Amino acid sequence: MLKKDSDAVKEALDQLSEVGWANKWSSQPYVSRRMTSLRELTTLGIKNAENLAIPSVRNDAAFLFTVVGTTGFLGVLAGQLPGDWGFFVPYLIGSISLVVLAVGSISPGLLQAAIGGFSSLFPDYQDRIARHEAAHFLVAYLLGLPILGYSLDIGKEHVNLIDKKLEKLIYSGQLDAKELDRLAVVAMAGLAAEGLQYDKVVGQSADLFTLQRLINRSKPQLSKEQQQNLTRWAVLFAGSLLKNNKVIHESLMSAMSKKATVLECIEAIEKAA
């Protein structure tokens, strides 16, 4: 179980399932994609379902507002300094906002890292991250995708679960409908988890990017309407799994928040089942 090899992890979990220990591993049978409406998402309990695919600007706006507001306030105070200091210091402080915008244009990654760090100040930050990543972990486990690692660290939030066979299919652009459906459900699990708990989803951008990458690597190619339906269906399926396994999801959230190992997280899933 400690091997960083997806085939070895999968084989070990299959054996544990056979002897009755890993009962939740790969326990969710395949369900083929179907037409799904926004009303079904709302009925499930997803809040503001019509806005799920719209990237949130909450963290970005709050960060930029804080930078501009703080520098503006400090600039006014600095203007009270005597002599030339009252001119040069406000000028230097005022330039901070321009520097931030310039960094965002030249190196967006640095700005996003700063915004990510700032986001941790929100009261719901830790719960959102744990809820989001635990959803990816749990849904992948239920669908039989081996988890090799995860992180809740700022700027590094992820669950590493793609196995070698699927990686080859993705890189070669040969994902079939069945595998695309399965991966789509895992990709949308974090978004679904947030949508079930909060009025607005914040961490959907990376999930939607992942889903689009998978769609682009699949055959046959999907039309825009089919892509939209796949997204809705995947959110519905993932949300249903999370609602039906709410206690397990919360137990996994707790374990991941304590930086438990992958094996300890799996134990948390099975004990809560």
Label the predicted regions.
Residues 1-68, 73-273:
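Soluble catalytic regions of large protease machineries
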